[in-house]
């Protein structure tokens, strides 16, 4: 349910991540210091900009691209990256398209990308860098060792943030079972959950850019976060005003700047509590998050429970007969819910000690 920021850039990075045939070809050109200009796509719009060169129409291979880059012109690849269509070609984009690039190769790449919306790759001969253009996007590919170092640093930061989130959530769990949770406790947990998810999004981008070299980072990330996002959404569902859509609230929280996210009063307004003191306002959870922790309870049954009882404390105080009357709950499931909540409470109180 995360808003997919930079989705287009992520797709580009996947195509040319380390380990892919395209990246191998680009690295070969980079090491040879010949420079190069590659365009990915074979639409009529692209081919109209191509002048001269040799029609190759050969299977793509990193070594072929490397050899063809020794010539001055650009290389045109098919959109599926399976064929080299032509080499040593001159690209003639519309010169009225604005560009802030300086070198001829990069100016051409920028204009072609803006005119056609295709991926164009410029490899600088002197600066030894690979720049990717697509539409208005410009991105400089970085060396894997640099990205790996940043990803590891981000993982260490994430570990600390997850530890803080765990403490905040464990405290909220105790308060929920005692029915003395305040608005301050709730918005702090929502805030911490969003902070963790923002670091996760950053690491996911690094993993995407690392390609097959990012497998270990991906495994560490999966181990660290587990159900953080799901719990964050259930927190919002537990405490937002009943006339509000939790999905809209979650999107709104994601849209906050880093400074706005630090403002707990602003967060409380987003979940529907305006002009009330954070510390003195007691609120009861609906029970989505806690009941969700009980094994083998389907989501539709949880919905029915919340609709019938409206608060977690009412579910806990309900008799087996009252639970049995809820649609989708029989005698066995009523016992599972009662026993499950009792065990959860005992476990949370033990963890406190």
From Swiss-Prot:
Subunit structure as annotated in this protein's UniProt entry: Homooctamer.
Cited function: Participates in a DNA-damage check-point that is active prior to asymmetric division when DNA is damaged. DisA forms globular foci that rapidly scan along the chromosomes during sporulation, searching for lesions. When a lesion is present, DisA pauses at the lesion site. This triggers a cellular response that culminates in a temporary block in sporulation initiation. Also has diadenylate cyclase activity, catalyzing the condensation of 2 ATP molecules into cyclic di-AMP (c-di-AMP). c-di-AMP acts as a signaling molecule that couples DNA integrity with progression of sporulation. The rise in c-di-AMP level generated by DisA while scanning the chromosome, operates as a positive signal that advances sporulation; upon encountering a lesion, the DisA focus arrests at the damaged site and halts c-di-AMP synthesis.
Keywords: ATP-binding, DNA damage, DNA repair, DNA-binding, Magnesium, Nucleotide-binding, Nucleotidyltransferase, Transferase
Family to which this protein belongs: Belongs to the DisA family.
Protein name: DNA integrity scanning protein DisA
Start and end residues of each DAC domain: 6-144
Residue numbers binding ATP: 73, 91, 104-108
Catalysed reaction equations from the record: 2 ATP = 3',3'-c-di-AMP + 2 diphosphate
E.C. number: 2.7.7.85
One of the GO BP terms on file: DNA repair
Requisite cofactors: Mg(2+)
Superkingdom to which the source organism belongs: Bacteria
Gene Ontology MF term list: adenylate cyclase activity; ATP binding; diadenylate cyclase activity; DNA binding
NCBIfam families assigned: PRK13482.1
Cystine pairings recorded for this chain: none
Record bears the keyword Magnesium: yes
């Amino acid at each position: 349910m995360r808003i997919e920021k930079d989705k287009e850039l992520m797709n580009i990075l996947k195509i040319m991540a380390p380990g892919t045939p395209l990246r191998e070809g680009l690295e070969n050109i980079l090491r040879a210091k010949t420079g190069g200009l590659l365009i990915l796509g074979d639409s009529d719009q692209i081919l109209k900009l191509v002048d001269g060169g040799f029609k190759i129409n050969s299977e793509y291979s990193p070594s072929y691209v490397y050899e063809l880059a020794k010539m001055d012109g650009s290389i045109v690849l098919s959109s599926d990256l399976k064929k080299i269509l032509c080499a040593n070609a001159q690209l003639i984009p519309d010169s009225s398209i604005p560009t802030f690039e300086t070198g001829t190769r990069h100016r051409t790449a920028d204009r072609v990308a803006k005119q056609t919306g295709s991926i164009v790759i410029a490899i600088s001969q002197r600066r030894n860098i690979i720049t990717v253009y697509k539409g208005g996007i410009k991105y400089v590919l970085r060396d894997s060792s640099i990205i790996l170092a940043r990803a590891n640093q981000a993982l260490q930061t994430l570990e600390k943030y997850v530890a803080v989130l765990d403490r905040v959530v464990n405290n909220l769990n105790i308060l929920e079972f005692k029915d003395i949770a305040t608005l301050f406790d709730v918005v702090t947990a929502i805030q911490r959950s969003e902070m963790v998810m923002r670091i996760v999004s950053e690491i996911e981008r690094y993993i995407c850019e690392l390609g097959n070299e990012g497998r270990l980072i991906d495994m560490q990330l999966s181990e660290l976060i587990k159900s953080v996002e799901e719990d964050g959404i259930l927190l919002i569902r537990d405490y937002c005003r009943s006339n509000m859509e939790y999905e809209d609230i979650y999107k709104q929280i994601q849209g906050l700047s880093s400074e706005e996210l630090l403002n707990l009063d602003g967060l409380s307004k987003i979940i529907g509590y305006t002009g009330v003191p954070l510390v003195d306002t007691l609120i009861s959870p609906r029970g989505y998050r806690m009941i969700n922790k009980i094994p083998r309870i389907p989501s539709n049954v949880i919905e029915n429970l919340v609709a019938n009882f409206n608060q977690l404390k009412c579910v806990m105080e309900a008799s087996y007969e009252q639970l049995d009357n809820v649609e989708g709950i029989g005698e066995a499931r009523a016992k599972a819910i009662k026993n499950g909540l009792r065990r959860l409470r005992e476990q949370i109180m033990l963890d406190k000690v």
